[in-house]
Amino acid sequence: MAGSVNKVILVGNLGADPEIRRLNSGDMVANLRIATSESWRDRQTGERKDRTEWHSVVIFNENLAKVAEQYLKKGAKVYIEGALQTRKWQDQNGNDRYSKEIVLQKFRGELQMLDSRSEGGEGRSFGGGGNRNQMSDYSGGGGDFGSSGPSSGSSGGFSRDLDDEIPF
């Protein structure tokens, strides 16, 4: 085996507008609170049960943070891909505390808006870099906000026209 994998994928809704701040270095950081929900039927009572889990997401990628600031609002449905990290901090009494966060680093991670902002009902995908070619804008308009490389027009050989007829 080649090592280990630390990858978190979430599809959920923002519980609040993104919190945008700047580090001492001047880098922009976005903090998101994302809710994921699951529902099931209780076998004994037949009653429908729901459970919501809240996730803290930190975006260190400046381009993705700008996208979050500009386009994301409370209630927006998003796809997030990042890594799980534990952050150690101290409370007011000096006690050590730990928080689990999904982190999108400068050149890793992905943010995809799943809500429609156009008539076509398609979402937009913004990548944080890496060595994958990926479609940065499914709707055909707008820019490649999260691209870190010089991939201006090509999408790894795939056509951007998603309405092509399937030959079978």
From Swiss-Prot:
- Segments carrying the region annotation (Disordered) are 113-168
DNA-binding positions are: 54-60
Q: Which PROSITE patterns match?
A: SSB
Q: Which InterPro entries match?
A: NA-bd_OB-fold, Primosome_PriB/ssb, ssDNA-bd
Q: Would you say which domain of life the source belongs to?
A: Bacteria
GO CC terms on record?
A: nucleoid
Keywords of this protein's UniProt record, alphabetized? DNA damage, DNA recombination, DNA repair, DNA replication, DNA-binding
The GO annotation for biological process reads:
DNA recombination; DNA repair; DNA replication
Keyword DNA damage included in the entry's annotation: yes
Q: Where is the signal peptide?
A: none
Where the record annotates domain SSB, the positions are 5-111
Motif Important for interaction with partner proteins: list the residue ranges: 163-168
The UniProt entry, under SUPFAM superfamilies, shows: Nucleic acid-binding proteins
Got any disulfides in this one, which pairs? none
Quote the biased-composition stretches of kind Low complexity, using this chain's numbering: 147-159
MF GO annotations: single-stranded DNA binding
* Coiled coil regions, renumbered to chain: none
Q: How does it assemble?
A: Homotetramer.
Function, as annotated? Plays an important role in DNA replication, recombination and repair. Binds to ssDNA and to an array of partner proteins to recruit them to their sites of action during DNA metabolism.
What is the recorded name of this protein?
Single-stranded DNA-binding protein
Q: Which organism is it from?
A: Brucella abortus (strain 2308)
